[in-house]
Curated annotation (Swiss-Prot):
GO cellular component, one term: early endosome membrane
DHHC domain segment(s): 436-486
Enzyme class, first EC level, given as a word: transferase
Keyword RNA-binding: no
Cytoplasmic side, ranges: 1-299, 342-354, 401-479, 540-702
Main location: membrane
Residues on Lumenal side: 376-379, 501-518
The protein, known as: Palmitoyltransferase AKR1
Keyword Acyltransferase among UniProt keywords: yes
Length: 702
């Protein structure tokens, strides 16, 4: 069945399958073997292909053999099969960059049309998502706006490939984002139909129109409903898709969803966009600032209310009433407050509610300490009070600094021209993939950086997003965050010791303070996640790992996840862009509710980290696989004193990207390659090498 025939069938809703259309691709593997496909692109017979030495050599990337055959005079780069297919077609579709370069240099026609689809080498490469081949052909005159017999240009075919990096590249070449095929479908229609949320997002941010209809009257939203990708549907709805638009046969998105059995996905997407299941918009009662303030200060009231209920109703009924009040308050927040700014099932976790839990707890600790504990214990335990007050004050200082500062955002580029220059540089280095380029912000990603979904920015040396401080943890505030956690780890036991003395004083005078007693229990519970977090952070610092890197290591191993790289094996810089654990990305499937609880308490990462510690305790190959690990001592010194000087006051300072790896000063905003931290190299590069970066670190202090 052809692509258009398949779409016609689906538009009539007479099929049950919701898989993406079989966009006709050349049936040749990278190894040179012909695949069994349903398309007829390769019109040349199998026998002829196998017997044509030039085709075989071009397909296999044997440039030396191609050169020998052409120079012998027996074959020419202009030779074509009966259907017009050339050696350049086969080299292009099999990602043979060196062979393509030789053929083009010898005069091969870059826009030669061939095959039953009458496609050019560029079309063949686009169907496979081969960025480097596409780049080379366009640089040498290939026309990306030329269409094949089905009316698809390079942008349509790139969308069919689902390689988001190729889509980004072509858009930066100036191709119209909403060019339509003969059936009126834009690249956005195709991306939505395929359920390709990444491509949908890229096209929408580039300005693709969600209101364009095809010849059947289908919006991209209609085609998205056929596939049922919740993320794709949410983005289309966010950008203004008409929830009540009818197709030519009179079907609205809701009717189509019911017939295609994707109603749950559509309603989930509507919820993610702050809409009711019928598509109407939820009322927004507050502005962004008021919404955040309400979410932040609500825990202050809930904590006090819980303490009062336990005090006057007893522990059992008090806890029951407190839990009921908590759920009621959260329901109220989700109904009246959160829709003004946050939507979806994780709306509460996106808000500053958890930061409010910590701050509210600290606030009531301060109130009770100043009004009850301090007056009763200062005379008998002055030193203990001094240490607690100092540690608690430092913890709160680090908390607010960590919460309010820039964690290390990579600066945005000024415009498309600068973005295009970055893309060209990465292609030249063989690094145009999601490890080195952010397709959301269009910035080059330094090593160890990552895109933060909450802030929508790339963060240098990204560790994680912490809901307890409501900020990303990156190169600038990571030390402050670890200090905050460690001060809490020390301060809470000191506070418990003070309360032990306080209750001893009360017993002597036959009095009791139930409010303080329940506050002690509440704060003691906070010590659980703080202990887990302290262990994880200290362990990872000793291993020179960030939390993001550790999580990706546990999910995908050292090779990481798919990075949408299509770098040819014979690219001049292919070996320089070997995979590493540092910038992998992806998602793991877990039970949403249980997983959220584990993440909030830090249990999941604690268990995983403990497992890694046991697994690698005697594994010396770890250092060889982790390019930043120079041993626990050096790793810790690099983290706490990146300027190479043992300066305790400098620990509290935040830089602007300066750091150290294995004794080498680095700028995490421009870390394109890891320094050599191998044992032999370290012997020849002593601590004095840090002096080279002291100027950078000194300038970056704030």
């Amino acid at each position: 069945m052809s692509t258009d025939a398949e779409l016609q069938t689906i538009s009539g809703l007479s099929v049950a399958s919701k898989s993406a259309p079989s966009t006709q691709t050349e049936g040749v593997t990278a190894s040179g073997k012909v695949e069994s496909t349903t398309n007829a692109e390769e019109a040349t017979s199998d026998v002829e292909e196998e017997e044509n030495p030039l085709v075989v050599a071009a397909r296999d990337g044997n440039t030396a053999e191609v050169k020998r055959l052409c120079e012998s005079g027996s074959y020419s780069v202009l030779d074509t099969a009966e259907d017009g297919v050339t050696a350049l077609h086969w080299a292009a579709v099999n990602n043979r960059i060196s062979t393509c370069q030789y053929l083009v240099e010898q005069g091969a026609v870059v826009d030669a049309k061939g095959g039953q689809l009458n496609g050019t080498p560029l079309h063949w490469a686009c169907r496979r998502g081969l960025v480097y081949i596409v780049h080379y052909l366009i640089q040498n005159g290939a026309d990306p706006l030329r269409s094949d017999v089905q009316g698809y240009n390079a942008l349509h075919l790139a969308t069919h490939s689902s390689n988001v990096m190729l889509l980004v590249y072509l858009l930066h070449q100036g191709l119209p984002v909403d060019c339509q095929d003969p059936n009126g479908r834009t690249a956005l229609h195709w991306a939505a139909y395929q359920g390709d949320a990444l491509s949908v997002d890229v096209l929408l941010r580039w300005g693709s129109d969600v209101k364009i209809t095809d010849t059947q009257g289908f919006l991209p939203l209609h085609w998205g409903i056929v596939n049922g990708s919740r993320n794709s549907l949410a983005r289309l709805i966010e950008e203004g898709s008409d929830m009540y638009a009818k197709s030519s046969d009179g079907k609205t998105p809701h009717v189509m969803a019911a017939e295609m059995n994707t109603t749950a996905q559509l309603e989930g997407a509507l919820d993610d966009c702050g809409r009711f299941p019928d598509g109407s918009q939820k009322t927004k009662y507050f502005d962004a600032r008021t919404t955040n303030l309400l979410c932040f200060f609500t825990p202050f009231i809930l904590i006090l209310l819980g303490l009062v209920l336990c005090t006057f109703c007893g522990p059992i009924f008090g806890i029951i009433l407190t839990v009921a009040t908590l759920f009621g308050s959260i329901k109220l927040l989700k109904t009246l407050v959160l829709p003004s700014l946050y939507n979806g099932h994780a709306a509460l976790l996106k808000s500053p509610f958890q930061a409010g839990i910590f701050t509210g707890s600290a606030f009531w600790v301060t109130v009770k300490y100043l009004t009850s504990v301090l007056p009763a214990t200062f005379a008998s335990h002055p030193i203990l009070n001094f240490f607690f007050a100092s540690i608690f004050g430092l913890a709160m200082y680090c908390f607010f600094r960590c919460m309010s500062m820039d964690p290390g955002y990579i600066p945005k580029l000024s415009g498309i021209t600068e973005q295009k220059e970055v893309i060209e540089t990465l292609i030249e280095r063989g690094e145009f993939d999601t490890r080195h380029f952010c397709f959301v912000t269009y910035v080059r990603k330094p090593l160890r950086s990552k895109f933060c979904r909450q802030s929508k920015r790339v963060v240098a040396r990204f560790d994680h997003f912490c809901p307890w401080v409501w900020n990303a943890i990156g190169v600038r505030n990571h030390r402050m965050f670890v200090l905050y956690v460690l001060f809490l780890q020390i301060g809470i036991p000191l506070w418990l010791a003070l309360n032990s003395a306080y209750f001893g004083e009360l017993l002597e005078i036959k009095r009791w303070d139930p409010l303080e007693f329940y506050l002690v229990i509440w704060i003691s519970l906070q010590l659980i996640w703080i202990t887990f977090l302290s262990f994880v952070q200290i362990f990872q610092i000793c291993r020179s790992l960030t939390t993001s890197e550790a999580v990706n290591l546990q999910k995908y191993g050292y090779m990481g996840a798919d990075d949408y790289s299509s770098v040819p094996l014979d690219h001049s810089a292919a070996t320089a862009s070997a995979k590493s654990v540092m910038n992998a990305h992806g998602h793991a499937a877990k039970s949403p509710c249980f997983s959220s609880v584990l993440k909030l308490l830090g249990v999941d990462q604690f268990v995983a980290t403990a497992g890694e510690a046991i697994k690698h305790r005697d594994n010396r190959s770890w250092k060889e696989k982790n390019p930043t690990d120079s041993g626990a001592g050096t790793n810790c010194f690099d983290f706490w004193f990146p300027n190479g000087k043992f300066d305790l006051l400098a620990v509290f300072e935040a830089g602007k990207g300066g750091g150290a790896i294995g004794g080498h000063a680095v700028d995490y905003y421009k870390l394109w390659d890891f320094p050599d931290v191998s044992p032999n190299q370290q012997q020849t590069n002593n601590r004095s090498t840090r002096e080279d970066g002291e100027a950078l670190l000194a300038e970056s202090q704030v």
